[in-house]
Amino acid sequence: MTSAGNPAVDPAARPFQGGRRLPLTWLGVTPFFVYVGLFLLLPTVVIVAGSITAGDGSLTLANLTNIQQAYLVKAFLNSFIVSLVSALIGAIGGALLAYAVATGNPRGALRRTVTSASGVLAQFGGVTLTFAFIATLGTIGFVTLFLKDRGLDVFANGVWLYELSGLILIYTYFQIPLMVLVFLPALDGIRPQWREATESLGGSTWHYWRYVAGPLLAPAFLGCTLLLFANAFSAYATAAALISQGGIIVPLQISNLFTSETGRAQPGLAKALALAMIVVVAIVMLLYALLQRRTSRWLR
């Protein structure tokens, strides 16, 4: 029995010798930190070290300066174009679809169908997605042949599917569902009472969106757009499956520099490119986090 002067002590909170408590509450997140350390921090350290190391093991900045070569700068520019255009298209299309879902029945079939499909399609990329587009819109795809039989040649001005425009089209396929998933919570945070208050004060729909909903949703929309940009900027598998030769975007250039078939592999330069990508994505995600923090103030 426990006396009144000696209450029972929870074994999980029993102190060590010296007064320190056993931090059992941290055990639940230990696998997360191990995962982050192995698959995020450790690769980053390897990339940073490799980007400033020469082939003989000595320190050098040549790899970092060599990323200024014209063909690598062009690859970065192409990556920015593909990421920005697909992010804007995905953000606008996804926001409109998310708004249609948010204004509908919260337990209706439309919301369940769209959210379930978005959860699947947002992760539907790589070889599978590329094959689907090639089988549909490739040079001998069934849609291409169907239109050609009716006098419409979609590739009359070139096989654009295997160029930047094709990448933008394919990236948009998973950008729109991702936008639905990340922007829908912000739309759900808009309360109907705010529109009613605007109307009771004599405001129109324009006033509601201009002075109430618009300013509230703008940080969330911009943050989600940045997330889509980072998602497209770092994508590799889809582009690699679509474009087997050449390196029109940075991830493909990194792959080519690692696995050169002519014996001229440059792993140091490849790691320098990867480091530049990490810096770009880190800046984008930092801006995204700042915008999300501002959005969370009124979503509480």
Task: Give the ranges of each region predicted by the language model.
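Short membrane-interfacial helix/loop motifs at transmembrane-helix boundaries
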Residues: 6, 33-73, 141, 148, ...
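Transmembrane-helix boundary motif in ABC transporter permease subunits
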Residues: 85-118, 131, 135, 289-293
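Membrane-interfacial helix termini and adjacent extracytoplasmic/periplasmic loops
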Residues: 18, 61, 130-172, 206, ...
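C-terminal transmembrane helix and the adjacent membrane-cytosol boundary/short C-terminal tail
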Residues: 2-11, 16, 26-28, 46, ...
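Non-cytoplasmic
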Residues: 43-47, 179-180, 220-256
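Transmembrane alpha-helices
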Residues: 31-39, 179-184, 191-192, 203-235
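Interhelical loop and adjacent transmembrane-helix boundary motif
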Residues: 14, 19-22, 64-71, 240-290, ...
